[in-house]
Amino acid sequence: MTIADIKKTTESKMGQSIEALKNNLARVRTGRANPSLLDSIHVDYYGSMVPLSQVANVNLLDARTISVQPWEKSMSAKVEKAIRESDLGLNPASLGDLIRVPMPPMSEERRKEMTKLARNEGEASKIAVRNLRRDANEAVKKLVKDKEASEDDQKRCEADVQKMTDKHITEIDALVAAKEQDIMAV
């Protein structure tokens, strides 16, 4: 593995950490309705647990209401039960073959919990990025030790990896700050 390969791999993995953070933050509840909020819910479908999106159509009715329309009418009760039993604190209402999921307004305490959860997700991503930096630096040190690269190359690579790390951590901070602002908006 060359220094260029190490940098390319590290950049790619750091980008994956950012994408994972975006997905995790999308699941953190804000005051507004968002169909991705229900992505983590699984429904019993003929004996196997499948994601809600595979048994129903999930859309927004308005800013505070999600509509869930199961493709099979027989699934309505199971879908409603799965949403109610999730840890999201939602109370779905069935209207025949359509299930309405109103978003209750969040209390100040719940907003603070969600903000803390968003910060924890951000911190986990920062740790992942820093671990990738450490792994890259160790790989370069091994190349120098094996005499496949010079110490000057090592210093340049470590500086480049540090710049990548700083850039990704700044992006993580921005994502978390935007999510916190979204959560705390009344």
UniProtKB/Swiss-Prot annotation:
Entry keywords, A to Z: Cytoplasm, Protein biosynthesis
Coiled-coil positions: none
Entries under SUPFAM superfamilies matching the protein: Ribosome recycling factor, RRF (SSF55194)
Top-level taxon of the source organism: Bacteria
Record-level Gene Ontology MF annotations: ribosomal large subunit binding
Locations listed in the record: Cytoplasm
InterPro entries reported in the protein's UniProt record: Ribosome_recyc_fac, Ribosome_recyc_fac_dom, RRF_sf
Keyword Nucleus appears in the UniProt entry: no
Annotated Gene Ontology cellular component terms: cytosol
UniProt key word Protein biosynthesis: yes
Gene Ontology biological-process entries: cytoplasmic translational termination
Listed NCBIfam families: frr (TIGR00496)
HAMAP family named in the record: RRF
Sequence similarity: Belongs to the RRF family.
Function: Responsible for the release of ribosomes from messenger RNA at the termination of protein biosynthesis. May increase the efficiency of translation by recycling ribosomes from one round of translation to another.
Protein's UniProt name: Ribosome-recycling factor
Organism: Delftia acidovorans (strain DSM 14801 / SPH-1)
Gene that encodes it: frr
